[in-house]
C-alpha cells in the first residue's frame, strides 16, 4: 500500500509542477532534488533486493555503500551498468518534464504544493522507512530488557551420549521443499525431512541473513551485529570472546569439534569464529586440496558439494570408529547465488520451471541429492543409533534465478532433526527463528534449553512467539549485542607484529591491513574483506576532521604522503586527518610500537579534496617513479600511458589474464628507443611453460620461453618505426581459480610477470 501511495504522490508532484508551477530556478532545483531522491531511494531498494532478496537490510548498509568487490561480482556488472544508465535516463527525463512550461510565469502555490507532494512521496516510500529504521538501529543505546532475555547456559552437558552431525545447506531454505510449488525438486532430502522433527516456521531476522551471521545465530543464539561489517570478520583475532556458544559447550563436555567446507575458511572469518568457540579441527579449500581425489575439481568458491560431503563421510567413519565423542559440522556451497553449481556425480543435473531450465533450481536439486546421500550413509552405518543429524539452511536464498518464484511463497529457513537414538516423525509449526537452532540441539543432547536469545523449540518459547515485532525488537537489541564484543573505546598506543601481520591496541587484536576511525569515545575498525572496498576508498569517505590510523602496504599511501616508499610492499602506518596533517611511518622492526598523534590543526578543504581525489584513483591509473615496471605494486611507471590484459598485483607480481585481454599490452607515452634490450623477469603458468611466447614491438617479434619458476630473460629489439607499444601473447591461457579472490569467476592465466625493464642500447 505504501508503495502505491508514494508513487501516486511522486506522480502528482511531477504533473503539478510541470503544468502549473511555471518558471523559477530555485523551485525547479528543489523539486528536482527531492524527486531525484525518491528515484535514488527506490533504485537503491531495487538494487538491494537484487542482492539480498530482503530489501535494504543490515548487510546492505555496508555491502552496497562500500563496494561490490567480492564474491561473484562479475555476474552483477551488467545489472549495475543497467541501473546507472537507467538512473541517468530517469533524471534527464524528469528534468525535461519539469521544465516543459518554463516560459510560463511562476506560481508560488503550485510550486509549494508540488514540493510538499514530492517530500510526501519520499516519506511514504518503503526505501526511506527501511533506511530510517537502519539509521535508528545504529544510534540507539540499546534496550533495557536485553539482560532479561539474554541467558547464558551451563558450560557443560551433564551426561552426553550422542554424537552430532550438523549440515548447513547454503541458502537451502525450506521453501524449496514445497512439493506443490516446486514438484519433485527435493525428493531425496524431502523424504528424510519428513522422517524427522521438521520445524516448519523458522524465520530470518536481522543479523542472521548471510552465512557467517546464520552460523553465529545458530551456534551462539545472537544475531551477528558488530562494530564493523560482518563479512569483514576475517580481520578480527577473536569472535564474541565473552560469549558461550554451542561449540564451547560441546568441547567442555568432551566432544572433539570438526568443521568441513569447500570454500576458504578465512572468508568472512569462519576460521576465527570457530576457533574462538571450541572447534580445533577445521577443513576448508586449503586443507582439503592435499587429500581430495581431484584437487582441480572446483567451482568459483572451492570444492563441490559431492567432494566435501565425501570427505565429511570419511571423517564421520574415522571418528565413529575411534569411540571419541564428536561433533561434525559441514557447510555446502553449490546452491550459492546467483546461479549455483552442479556437482558432476549427482543424477539430478537439470530442473525445468515454467517450461525452461533453471540453473538455481537445478543446483538445489543436485545439492539436496548429495546431502541425502551423505545422510543415508550415516543412517545405514552401525553408528547411527548414537548420532543426531541436523540439517538447516544458513539463511534464506538471496537473489538467484529462482528468487522471483520463491517470493511468491511463504518463505522460511530449513531446520530438521533426525535422531538415531529415538526416531521421531513430526512437523512442528511453532514460530521460531535461527537463534533457536543451537538451543534446540543443546536440549536434545541433554543440555540447557536456552542459548543467548535462543530457546529450544521442544521445551521453550521462542522470542518470535514472545514478540510480535521481533524484527524491530532484534534491531533494538543491536547496541547491546555489539557491546558483547567488549571492543575498546580508545586507542592511545598500538603494536604491530610483522610475523603475525597483526595490530594490537587496548587489548584487541586485528589482522592487517586495517583502517581505524578514532574519536574521543569510539574506535571504529574498518577491515578489508572480499565484500568491502579497498581501505583507501573507505578512507576517502572520511570527513575532513575525522582522525584515522591506516596500516597497509607502503606503496598504497605513498602516492599521497610518502613518494619515496612508492615501490615498498612493507607495512606502513599513516595517521592524521584528511583535511589536516598526516604522517607516514615505515614499520621497520618485527615488533613495532607507536602512539596515536592527532594534532588539532586548521582544516584545509583544498588539501582535503586533493587527498580524496588521490585516494579514489583506480589502481591502473596510479603512476610511480621507476626505471622499470614493477608488478607487485599497483599502477605503472610514469612513462606508461596505459596497459591491459594484466590481473591485480599479488605479493610476487601479476599474472596475465586473458579474461581482461588476449594479449598483454603496455603502451608508453613516448616511442620506445631505436635500439633497446627488454629485460623480462617472469614465469609461465601450466601449459604455457616451455612454449614459445611471442613478444612484439612494432613490426619486430622476438620469442620468449619461460618455465614454471621465475627467470630473467633479455630480448634485443630494433625499433625503426618508433613504436610505443609492447605486446606479449601467452600461447595457451589456462582457466583456473588458483590464487583467485573467493567467489570470483576463474581467471585465464598465461605468464606471471615480476618486472619488465627497457634498457636503451647505444648506436
From Swiss-Prot:
The chain crosses the membrane at residues 4-19, 26-48, 76-98, 105-127. One of its GO terms (cellular component) is plasma membrane. Pfam families: DUF7024 (PF22895), Sulfatase (PF00884). It catalyses: a phosphatidylglycerol + a membrane-derived-oligosaccharide D-glucose = a 1,2-diacyl-sn-glycerol + a membrane-derived-oligosaccharide 6-(glycerophospho)-D-glucose. It is found in: Cell inner membrane. It comes from the Bacteria. GO terms for biological process: glucan biosynthetic process. Pathway: Glycan metabolism; osmoregulated periplasmic glucan (OPG) biosynthesis. The keyword Magnesium does not apply. InterPro entries: Alkaline_phosphatase_core_sf (IPR017850), DUF7024 (IPR054288), OpgB (IPR020881), OpgB/LTA_synthase_biosynth (IPR050448), Sulfatase_N (IPR000917). It is a multi-pass membrane protein. It is an enzyme of class 2 (transferase). GO terms for molecular function: phosphatidylglycerol-membrane-oligosaccharide glycerophosphotransferase activity. Keywords: Cell inner membrane, Cell membrane, Membrane, Transferase, Transmembrane, Transmembrane helix. The keyword Nucleotidyltransferase does not apply. Its EC number is 2.7.8.20. Belongs to the OpgB family. Transfers a phosphoglycerol residue from phosphatidylglycerol to the membrane-bound nascent glucan backbones. This is Phosphoglycerol transferase I. It comes from Shigella flexneri. The lineage of its organism: Bacteria, Pseudomonadati, Pseudomonadota, Gammaproteobacteria, Enterobacterales.
Amino acid at each position: 500500500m505504501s508503495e502505491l501511495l508514494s508513487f501516486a504522490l511522486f506522480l502528482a508532484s511531477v504533473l503539478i509542477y510541470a503544468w502549473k508551477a511555471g518558471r523559477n530556478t530555485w523551485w525547479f532545483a528543489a523539486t528536482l532534488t527531492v524527486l531525484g531522491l525518491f528515484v535514488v531511494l527506490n533504485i537503491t531498494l531495487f538494487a538491494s533486493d537484487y542482492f539480498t532478496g530482503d530489501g535494504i537490510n543490515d548487510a546492505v548498509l555496508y555491502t552496497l555503500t562500500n563496494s561490490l568487490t567480492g564474491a561473484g561480482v562479475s555476474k552483477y556488472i551488467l545489472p549495475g551498468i543497467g541501473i546507472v544508465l537507467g538512473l541517468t535516463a530517469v533524471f534527464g527525463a524528469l528534468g525535461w518534464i519539469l521544465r516543459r512550461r518554463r516560459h510560463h510565469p511562476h506560481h508560488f502555490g503550485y510550486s509549494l504544493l508540488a514540493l510538499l507532494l514530492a517530500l510526501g512521496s519520499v516519506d511514504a516510500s518503503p526505501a526511506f522507512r527501511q533506511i530510517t529504521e537502519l539509521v535508528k538501529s545504529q544510534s540507539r543505546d540499546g534496550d533495557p530488557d536485553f539482560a532479561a532475555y539474554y541467558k547464558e547456559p551451563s558450560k557443560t552437558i551433564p551426561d552426553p551420549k550422542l554424537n552430532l552431525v550438523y549440515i548447513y545447506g547454503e541458502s537451502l531454505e525450506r521453501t524449496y521443499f514445497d512439493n506443490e510449488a516446486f514438484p519433485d525438486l527435493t525428493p531425496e532430502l524431502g523424504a528424510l525431512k519428513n522422517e524427522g522433527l521438521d520445524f516448519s516456521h523458522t524465520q530470518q531476522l536481522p543479523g542472521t541473513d548471510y552465512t557467517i551471521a546464520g552460523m553465529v545465530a545458530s551456534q551462539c543464539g545472537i544475531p551477528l551485529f558488530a562494530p564493523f561489517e560482518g563479512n569483514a570478520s576475517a580481520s578480527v583475532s577473536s569472535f564474541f570472546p565473552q560469549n558461550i556458544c554451542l561449540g564451547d559447550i560441546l568441547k567442555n563436555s568432551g566432544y572433539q569439534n570438526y568443521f568441513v567446507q569447500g570454500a576458504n575458511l578465512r572468508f568472512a572469518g569462519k576460521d576465527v569464529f570457530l576457533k574462538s568457540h571450541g572447534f580445533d579441527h577445521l577443513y576448508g579449500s586449503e586443507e582439503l586440496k592435499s587429500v581430495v581425489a581431484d584437487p582441480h575439481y572446483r567451482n568459483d568458491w572451492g570444492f563441490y558439494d559431492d567432494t566435501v560431503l565425501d570427505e565429511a563421510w570419511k571423517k564421520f567413519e574415522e571418528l565413529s570408529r575411534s569411540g571419541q565423542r564428536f561433533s561434525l559440522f559441514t557447510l555446502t556451497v553449490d546452491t550459492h547465488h546467483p546461479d549455483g553449481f552442479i556437482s558432476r556425480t549427482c543424477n539430478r543435473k537439470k530442473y525445468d520451471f515454467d517450461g525452461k531450465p533453471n540453473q538455481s533450481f537445478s543446483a538445489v536439486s543436485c545439492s539436496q541429492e548429495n546431502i541425502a546421500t551423505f545422510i543415508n550413509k550415516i543412517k545405514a552405518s552401525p553408528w547411527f543409533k548414537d548420532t543426531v543429524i541436523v540439517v538447516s539452511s544458513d539463511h534464506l536464498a538471496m537473489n538467484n534465478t529462482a528468487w522471483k518464484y520463491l517470493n511468491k511463497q511463504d518463505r522460511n529457513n530449513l531446520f530438521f532433526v533426525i535422531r538415531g537414538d529415538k526416531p521421531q516423525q513430526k512437523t512442528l509449526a511453532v514460530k521460531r527463528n535461527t537463534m533457536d537452532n543451537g538451543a534446540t540441539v543443546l536440549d536434545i543432547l541433554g543440555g540447557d534449553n536456552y542459548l543467548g536469545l535462543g530457546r529450544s523449540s521442544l521445551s521453550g518459547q521462542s522470542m518470535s512467539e514472545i514478540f510480535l515485532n521481533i524484527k524491530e525488537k532484534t534491531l533494538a537489541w543491536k547496541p547491546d549485542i555489539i557491546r558483547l564484543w567488549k571492543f575498546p573505546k580508545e586507542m592511545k598506543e598500538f603494536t604491530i607484529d610483522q610475523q603475525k601481520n597483526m595490530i594490537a591496541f587496548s587489548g584487541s587484536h586485528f589482522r592487517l591491513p586495517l583502517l581505524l576511525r578514532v574519536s574521543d569515545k569510539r574506535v571504529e575498525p574498518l577491515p578489508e574483506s572480499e565484500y568491502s572496498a579497498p581501505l583507501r576508498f573507505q578512507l576517502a569517505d572520511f570527513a575532513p576532521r575525522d582522525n584515522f590510523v591506516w596500516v597497509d602496504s607502503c606503496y598504497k599511501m605513498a602516492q599521497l604522503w610518502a613518494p619515496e616508499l612508492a615501490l615498498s610492499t612493507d607495512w606502513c602506518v599513516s595517521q592524521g586527518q584528511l583535511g589536516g596533517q598526516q604522517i607516514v611511518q615505515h614499520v621497520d622492526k618485527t615488533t613495532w610500537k607507536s602512539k596515536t598523534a592527532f594534532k588539532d590543526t586548521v582544516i584545509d578543504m583544498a588539501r582535503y579534496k586533493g587527498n580524496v581525489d588521490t585516494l579514489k584513483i583506480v589502481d591502473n591509473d596510479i603512476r610511480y617513479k621507476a626505471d622499470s615496471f614493477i608488478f607487485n605494486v599497483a599502477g605503472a611507471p610514469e612513462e606508461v600511458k596505459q596497459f591491459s590484459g594484466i590481473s591485480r598485483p599479488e605479493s610476487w607480481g601479476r599474472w596475465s589474464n586473458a579474461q581482461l585481454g588476449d594479449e598483454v599490452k603496455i603502451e608508453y607515452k613516448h616511442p620506445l628507443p631505436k635500439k633497446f634490450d627488454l629485460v623480462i623477469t617472469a614465469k609461465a603458468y601450466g601449459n604455457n611453460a616451455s612454449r614459445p611466447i611471442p613478444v612484439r614491438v612494432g613490426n619486430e617479434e622476438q620469442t620468449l620461453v619461460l618455465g614454471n619458476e621465475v627467470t630473467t630473460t633479455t630480448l634485443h629489439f630494433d625499433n625503426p618505426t618508433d613504436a610505443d607499444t609492447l605486446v606479449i601473447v601467452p600461447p595457451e591461457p589456462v582457466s583456473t581459480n588458483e590464487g583467485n579472490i573467493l567467489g570470483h569467476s576463474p581467471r585465464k592465466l598465461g605468464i606471471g610477470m615480476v618486472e619488465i625493464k627497457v634498457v636503451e642500447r647505444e648506436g
